[in-house]
């Protein structure tokens, strides 16, 4: 069989044609054109240069031409922003005259532009693509001359000079630094040239006064820039007639440039504003004299000989030592705080040292007291005083006044008083000692006593209704042995004659009870036989009951029979006694009742 060899799949290859680039990689110019609809619309905007046009430096500052390069945003972008996007015109419109009018109505001083030029990075010089028409240049020249004449006629500079003190007029370095600060731009309003000039100049004065407080914070690099600007102002102020001769392209400022300067100076203005707030708070605390000293003239005629690099660098930016502000700081300083001890042990040692030194430096005033009987005198007294504080004695440690007040204890000044007064004061002090509040204990009643609510209850005593009485039911008496009787007379007669049987007491409650017992057991009469220790004879006591008498007779007969029997058989006699018939006490356990009859021995 033929083996089937599997085919190996071919390796995938990459595409030769690549996909379209994403929107992020497209150039910004193409993206903006698509967004604004320049392809579809009939508006033809001029080409945008890659770099911004640079202003050519003035003739007076040709030496510093390298640092005067300014990059300005192109005009077409702002022109597109000013025109609404929704409106699409069929015919192209010329917008140059509108821009020129705005430029003419918003004059900007030279220092502002110079500062912007220094802050912006240097770019390559590229000539602008658009050229100005001859009619526009003539209009710009006429507007510039009119604005310069308006500034020359205004007396605002004189008012600012009057505010400044004559002492600081000669300080040229500070004036040059003032001119370096930017000027706030006023909003664009379509009004006459004179009204615009009047509105701008007061704002320049206010901003220059606020910038004076920031002068000490400038670095020497800023001072070198101030020298360059001072030289530029020199040429502009000394020869105002020469300014119109300068070509309008160099001196004129467009709306584009103003927008770029506004964007660039926003970051630079935020930091000075914060510093102005701090400095304004510090200057508000000073006296009116200080405010007059800080006020400085805004404008000053500068000649080429007066400007020098040494004058531009401020020598002493710190305030003078003799000024009242520094005097207030010196007076307002609090005294140095004493160092606290590092631990409680160090604090205690320091307190103990102060207590030992206290009686030596501040002796307490001694009152006239009565002479003590057992006191020292002469050299001994002086010796005793020298020992003060060297040997520790009870009560010698002096308390601090705060602790003494809290405890209510007398201080060391009381030691000089007499013995009697000291004793009385000690008793008062003990009474004045604050009583420490005792801990609240649980409320307990009196020890081993019931509370009143329980003790007031009456106790109930139970009385038994049964009465117990003790009665003599019968008695037993012992007599000597009787002689043997020869004749067989009945024992009953002898007993009655000799009164051997004691009669019972008269019938009463006891007899009634005994009768009840006899009735309950008539067959078993109550009978007790007691034997004497000297003889075998026994005396029988019985009651008057006839049943007992019969039993006695029966026992007598038995006794006689025993006597008649021979004495040689005593054992048989004992056996006869053990029987139930011969045992006279066999019935007692059954009939005896402890409740009714109690045995009472006679005396």
From Swiss-Prot:
Regions of compositional bias (Polar residues) in chain numbering: 251-264, 305-326, 529-550
Location(s) in or outside the cell: Cytoplasm, Cytoskeleton, Actin patch
Bias (Basic residues): 438-451
Compositional bias annotation for Acidic residues: 169-179, 508-522, 558-581, 591-603
Keywords tagged on the record: Cytoplasm, Cytoskeleton
Pfam families assigned to the protein according to its UniProt record, in alphabetical order: Aim21
Low complexity bias spans: 349-358
Disulfide bonds: none
GO annotation, cellular component aspect: actin cortical patch
Entry-linked InterPro entries: Aim21
Region (Disordered): 1-91, 163-381, 407-457, 478-603
Bias (Basic and acidic residues): 17-42, 180-196, 267-280, 422-433
Stated family: Belongs to the AIM21 family.
Role description: Involved in mitochondrial migration along actin filaments.
Protein name (Swiss-Prot/TrEMBL): Altered inheritance of mitochondria protein 21
Species per Swiss-Prot/TrEMBL record: Kluyveromyces lactis (strain ATCC 8585 / CBS 2359 / DSM 70799 / NBRC 1267 / NRRL Y-1140 / WM37) (Yeast)
Lineage: Eukaryota, Fungi, Dikarya, Ascomycota, Saccharomycotina
